[in-house]
From Swiss-Prot:
Keywords assigned: Late protein, Virion
Ubl conjugation is among the record's keywords: no
Cellular component terms (Gene Ontology): virion component
Name of the molecule in the record: Uncharacterized protein H171R
Region Disordered: start-end pairs: 68-124, 140-171
Main subcellular location: virion
Location in or out of the cell: Virion
Length: 171
């Protein structure tokens, strides 16, 4: 869609040129790459390039130059540091330092202890999560209690409500 909007904004001649390039793009890409490789290797043997292909290569070079002009990075030394330097992590006095995992005492041949410790740790996490969810649910119950005190009064029936009955749809 963006490409279509861009094409509409271009002149008729440019659209024709772009359609021509698009129609011959596959064959052109192969030839253009070969042409660039030969040019970069500074081989002086002339290539058999048709005038059409030469025109296409000029168009593509022009488009690439325009693209590079518009998308050039600002000049200057490359940034080696991020814009906002990272602050070193400071441990608060309340935090306990993280200890490396220590294998429970026992033989390595007994995987039961390892399984038990893993299971115990997951149960502990599950308990903490369930406590957290219970706390959230309790907060939700408090909100429901507050909502019940803020109920709006029932709408009183007006005489004009009876008129609405006259226009009811009957099946």
């Amino acid at each position: 869609m963006v490409v279509y909007d861009l094409l509409v904004s271009l002149s008729k001649e440019s659209i024709d040129v772009l359609r021509f390039v698009e129609a011959n793009l596959a064959a052109f890409n192969q030839q253009y790459i070969f042409f660039n490789i030969q040019r970069k290797n500074s081989i002086t043997t002339p290539l058999l390039i048709t005038p059409q292909q030469e025109k296409i290569s000029q168009i593509v070079e022009f488009l690439m130059d325009e693209y590079n002009k518009n998308n050039r990075r600002p000049s200057g030394p490359p940034r080696e540091q991020p814009m906002h330097p990272l602050l070193p992590y400071q441990q608060s006095p309340d935090e306990q330092p993280m200890m490396p995992y220590q294998q429970p005492p026992g033989n390595d041949d007994q995987p039961y202890e390892q399984i038990y410790h893993k299971k115990h740790a997951s149960q502990q996490v599950n308990t903490e999560l369930s406590d957290y969810y219970q706390h959230i649910l309790a907060l939700g119950d408090e909100d429901k209690g507050m909502d019940s005190t803020l109920k709006l009064p029932e709408r009183t029936k007006r005489d004009s409500d009876d008129e609405d009955g006259m226009f009811s749809i009957k099946n």
